[in-house]
A protein has these predicted regions:
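C-terminal scaffolding/assembly regions of large eukaryotic complex subunits
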Residues: 1-155
Length: 155
């Protein structure tokens, strides 16, 4: 994010880090847009999105979630990490941690949630889904409803 309250032009031109996330791809383009048609005015949740493209041809979506939705999805992501085994035994949090080339260290992802991981809740067995739901103290049907709504808004 840009620091519009900075005192000098140099400080104002410097971007501040607001989030970090390892994607595993080299992003080479960002554009405003969405993969879905515009919503009707009466829809409950509107999510501003950016599309990105990578050198390998991946198209992805960055969605700016309202605070309550972000907090819910972050809690769900944390619970899912405890109940889902990563590919090759790699933990999701380790895969998404961001390595700083200048600082020479890795930091956990911050201010991002992994939409693919969140959506994978819909593919869990009923037993695992109930365990995740109990972990965040939200009814399984409510989680399904909210994840499906996010899918509809961002795909």
């Amino acid at each position: 994010a840009r620091n519009v309250n900075a005192m000098t032009d140099e400080e104002r031109s410097r971007l501040e880090i607001t989030g970090e996330y390892h994607l595993g791809e080299l992003v080479n383009v960002f554009t405003r847009g969405s993969l879905v048609m515009s919503m009707r005015d009466g829809e409950s949740l509107q999510v501003p999105t950016l599309l990105f493209g990578t050198g390998n041809g991946v198209i992805g979506v960055l969605a700016s979630l309202p605070k309550d939705v972000y907090e819910f999805t972050e809690r769900l992501q944390t619970a899912m990490n405890k109940h889902i085994q990563g590919v090759g035994g790699l933990k999701h949090a380790d895969w998404r941690s961001f390595r700083h080339t200048l600082r020479g260290k890795s930091d956990p992802a911050s201010n991002f949630v992994d939409g693919d991981l969140i959506e994978s809740f819909l593919d869990l067995s009923p037993e695992r889904a109930e365990a995740v739901a109990a972990e965040i103290d939200v009814d399984r049907a409510e989680i399904v409803r909210r994840v499906e709504e996010l899918q509809r808004l961002t795909h």
